[in-house]
Amino acid sequence: MHSRLPPVTQALLIANVALFLLQSLLGPATFEPFALWPPTGLFDPFSPGRNFQPWQLLTYGFLHGSLGHLLFNMLALYMFGAPLELTWGPRRFLAYYLICVVGAGLCQLAVGWWSVSSGGPVYATVGASGGVFGLLLAYGM
C-alpha cells in the first residue's frame, strides 16, 4: 500500500475528526438537527428539533457519540477504506461509502419507526458505522 492516504479516505477521516471536535466544543444540542431521528411526526423544515429531516440520512454519518466511537470507526475507515479507494478510484469509493451510509440510515429509520410506534423511546443515531460496515463487506468480498 502507498505511504500516503488516498484523497477521499483522508478527507473522510479529517471531516469526521473535525466534526467531533466541533461537537465537543459546541455541545451535543448544537448538532441534534444533524443526528438521525426516527420519524415521529410530520416533516417540518422550520422545526428540525428531534424529528426526522431528509439531510440527516447523510449528516448522521459524520457525528459520533464518544471518543472511542470515533476512534474505532476511523481505524476501520483507514484499514478498509484506503485499499478499496486505491482499487476502485476515488469517485466509485465515495459513491459506495455514501450509499452505505444512506442505506444504513434507511434501515435505522425503519427500526426506529417500529420502535417508536411500539411505545419505545425516541433516540438519535450517529456514527460512521453504516459506511464502515459497508466497506468491511466490500473488503471481505
Task: Report the location of each language-model feature.
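Cytosolic juxtamembrane amphipathic/interface segments immediately preceding
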Residues: 1-2
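N-terminal TM1-TM2 helical hairpin plus the immediately adjacent luminal interfacial "cap"
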Residues: 5-126
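Membrane-interface micro-motifs in multi-pass membrane enzymes
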Residues: 121-141
